[in-house]
């Protein structure tokens, strides 16, 4: 059965039409933005073992085989495959990639191959260990994105369900800020916040904490994807009308107080935003992640046939993340088919519609 997003009456060049294999390879699925990094990116999942237990984790409780680590020889082959395919940016994902036994060697091999942007997405608890962090930086790590979702110990530890994790993350961030000032991490250091029902009201305070108290200059918020532990949970996944006013306040604060810093958001359908924002291309290019994110392919361990656009080879699922969201993980309600913004908007997480329905979405 075709996904609801695939409008059978849509023309082949419509954003609602499933991409052909050639179009997927071309990755011409993003709008032009002068400040977007044009390097083609791949994110390699090292395994889903993690030392946090976030209440919104999309993996929930992974199967034992999914918690196993990717063998190092497989990692080397995968890095070589993507470099030969044209990628010059690579990110290591988990689970938690800093627990991967060969993360330093993998970083060094990526640099040896010629990757110019080498990143990890991490909860950063292990990065408080300076000798370990120094090894990663010296191996060639150029960017760190840190998952942190609260500005207080109470909030962060409630969301991650790990005691004393807040202090460890703060210690890691302060050290990474120091190293960035020394010239490390030329591709940046950021915190990624999953905006959810427990923390969205604290967004302005979180901005002040991360920018002013910890000294960061890059903050990203993503609306929660209600799968895994958060599936079907309206407390964790609030309705957009409750959250959007806090997003707008955050943008206003960024314009007034943190204009030199980077603040971006993702996961908000454009029809949920006020006209003054969604119709202002200058603001969208500055703040909307879909205008700024790298074109990203993904490689994840997979047994079986998979589904949707993913291609399975050598036990790995490979897909483009922008296409995966639009065609497999999100729905386009009926309103999307007549919306003037459909070329930019990716739709709505399927899990959100399962919780709240789609009556709130209207064409613009």
Language model feature labels by segment:
Residues 6-8, 154, 162-170, 174, ...:
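Radical SAM enzyme [4Fe-4S]-AdoMet core and its adjacent flexible, acidic
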Residues 44, 48-51, 265, 330-333:
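Processing junctions and N-termini across compartments
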Residues 61, 94, 122, 148, ...:
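Residues that line or immediately flank small-molecule/substrate-binding pockets and catalytic motifs
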Residues 57, 61-64, 278, 343-346, ...:
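Cys/His-rich zinc-coordinating "finger/knuckle" motifs
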Residues 72-91, 100-224:
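Radical SAM/AdoMet-radical enzyme domain recognition
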Residues 2-15, 19-33, 290-364:
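Flexible mid-to-C-terminal extensions adjoining Fe-S/redox cofactors in radical SAM and related proteins
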Residues 3-12, 16-131, 135-139, 143:
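Conserved alpha-helical substructure of the radical SAM core
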């Amino acid at each position: 059965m075709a996904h609801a997003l695939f409008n059978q009456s849509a023309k082949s060049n419509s954003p609602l039409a499933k991409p052909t294999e050639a179009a997927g390879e071309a990755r011409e699925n993003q709008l032009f933005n002068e400040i977007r990094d044009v390097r083609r990116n791949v994110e390699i999942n090292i395994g889903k073992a993690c030392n946090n237990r976030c209440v919104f984790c999309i993996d929930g409780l992974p199967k034992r085989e999914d918690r196993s680590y990717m063998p190092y020889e497989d990692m080397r082959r995968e890095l070589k495959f993507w470099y030969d395919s044209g990628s010059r940016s690579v990110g290591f994902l988990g689970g938690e990639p800093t627990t991967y036994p060969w993360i330093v060697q993998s970083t060094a091999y990526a640099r040896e191959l010629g990757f110019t942007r080498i990143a990890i997405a991490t909860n950063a608890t292990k990065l408080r260990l300076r000798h370990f962090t120094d090894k990663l930086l010296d191996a060639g790590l150029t960017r760190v994105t840190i998952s942190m979702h609260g500005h207080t110990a109470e909030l962060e530890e409630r969301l991650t369900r790990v005691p004393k994790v807040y202090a460890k993350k703060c210690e890691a961030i302060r050290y990474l800020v120091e190293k960035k000032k020394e010239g490390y991490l030329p591709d940046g250091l950021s915190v990624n916040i999953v905006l959810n029902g427990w923390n969205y009201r604290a967004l302005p305070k979180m901005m002040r904490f991360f920018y002013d108290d910890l000294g960061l200059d890059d903050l990203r918020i993503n609306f929660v994807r209600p799968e895994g532990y958060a599936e079907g949970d309206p407390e964790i996944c609030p309705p957009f009308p409750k959250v959007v006013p806090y997003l707008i306040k955050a943008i206003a604060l960024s314009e007034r107080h943190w204009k030199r810093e980077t603040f971006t958001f993702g996961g908000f359908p454009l029809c949920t935003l006020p006209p003054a924002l969604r119709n202002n291309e200058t603001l969208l290019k500055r703040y909307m992640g879909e205008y700024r994110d790298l074109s990203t392919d993904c490689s994840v361990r997979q047994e079986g046939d998979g589904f949707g656009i993913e291609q399975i080879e050598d036990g790995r699922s490979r897909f483009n993340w922008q296409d995966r969201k639009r065609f497999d993980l999100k729905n386009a309600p009926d309103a999307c088919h007549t919306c003037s913004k459909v070329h930019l908007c990716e739709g709505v997480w399927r899990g959100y519609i399962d919780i709240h329905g789609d009556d709130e979405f209207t064409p613009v």
